[in-house]
Amino acid sequence: MKKVIVTGGSGFIGTNLVNFLIRRKFFVINIDKLTYSSNNYNDKIRNKLNYKFFKLDINNKKKLYSLIKKYKPKAIFNLAAETHVDRSIDGPKPFINTNINGTFNLLECLRELKSEIDVKLIHIS
């Protein structure tokens, strides 16, 4: 069974991707910090044998690195992002933290693990 990581797997697009992959028998590791844009759609699959959920901010590089190293996924779908333009104008800091710094952390983890795992990164913007 191919392992994949989905960051932001509890948002609107993420839940649909996670459920699509589960139905196709992938082992899915969902990483999400469960902010305002999360939903509980994945509750229906939480007991599936091919699904794991970790409440985690992708800015936590140490834990992110650990999960990638442990599961050695074949692909990572990066959907983790702060959304809603209005919110970004009123308070841009969380958007910069997740959308830029968090993505950088993910890239750094993959760079540091490049000799240990062969993984494809699919970045959704």
Where are these regions (language model features)?
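N-terminal Rossmann-like NAD(P)+-binding domain of SDR-like oxidoreductases, especially those catalyzing
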Residues: 1-125
